[in-house]
Amino acid sequence: MKIKHIFLFFLLTLIGACSDNSKKDYDLIIRNGLIYDGSGNAPISSDIAINGSFIALIGDLSNSTAKKEVNAEGMAVAPGFINVLSWATQPLIIDGRAMSDIKQGVTLEIMGEGRSMGPLNESMKIREKNRQSNIKYDIEWTTLGEYLDFIVEQGVSVNVASYVGATTIRVHELGYEDRAPTSDELERMKQLVRNAMREGALGVGSSLIYTPANFAETDELIALVSAAAEYNGRYISHLRSEANKLEEAVLELIKISSITGAPAEIYHLKAAGKKNWYKLENVFNLIETAKASGLRISANMYTYAAAATGLDATMPPWSQEGGHDEWVKRLKSKKNRDLLSEEMLNADSDWENFFMQAGPEGILLTGFKNPDLKKYIGKTLSEVSNLRGTS
């Protein structure tokens, strides 16, 4: 079998990296691999010696032996990959092996973009329990730290870390109401962030196109990120807009970083909708200008012209105020459906209108909770509309 580019992964602590021609014995030697060390430097062809869980040496090990040897000729050797936007929060509960990521070389899952697995109050636990689909589990934790302890104690192959979700903090105190927190509520929200940081959270994560996250004003986010910054926490964000108001959304993130002093990272940076593609150059300039001023601003992105989200992102925020049950109740009203249709067909709406950015021909349906609808998986929204005789 011809192997063009197979990756061999390691996540070990580097304690030596020099050539050694003396005779030594190791637990493991990986020979002749093309080493990508994660620094961005050009790869080097070399050997790697491992003792226990540590890299003992990188270099010429032709005179050394090991209990086990791997010939990595023609293969690449790299540190374990980091999934910076992991939604394995629930799958890891029922199967800690994480095989879908482990087999791709991922060794660290970072969660908490907007929503996190804690802190939870009793009503949040009931709501989460009622909304479980194929993955069923008991919620045996309350705080984010307790969730992380739970999956580690249960057994998990990957390393895990999490931001505390700004949405989770908001729902904990305000539910799904579209309003600003009172001063007392905001103080409790800040304290929840501090508690999460003491439990090991990386910082605060937001996902501002989704309800109820988009009910939060900038000042609310500044307050939460400031609390995280007391513990050297970071801020990550799915921006408030990735389309018509992309530049304004980037400036909001820069403002939050500037006021709080927290490093900030834009998650899956993009310009959604062809009419907005030209904005990326200006966004790059905004980021570089902020960095030149001393702010620690970064971004990550994926290299394809698509996105994945829920159909809730195609409907205006007002329709979802109050949570899932209130949203469904509104959809049962013909008056509301007519109003929704009118707003969804407005390409210049104030909210992040993914329906118009992609169009019904560009929206691919990939999952349903209702078994009767699973037959539509893999079809576009336009195809399903034609099959059902609806619009």
For every predicted segment, state its role.
Residues 2-9:
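Sec-dependent signal peptide recognition
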Residues 15-17:
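C-terminal motif of bacterial Sec signal peptides marking the signal peptidase cleavage site
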Residues 22-28, 35, 39-80:
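Histidine-rich, glycine-flanked metal-binding segment
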Residues 33, 53, 74, 85, ...:
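Divalent metal-coordination and catalytic microenvironments
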Residues 72-142:
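Metal-associated gating/positioning segment near the N- to mid-region
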Residues 90-98, 185-195, 249:
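Short, acidic/polar
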Residues 148-151, 156-183, 189-210, 221, ...:
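Active-site neighborhoods of metal-dependent hydrolases
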Residues 218, 222-237:
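Alpha-helix-loop-beta-strand connector modules within alpha/beta enzyme cores
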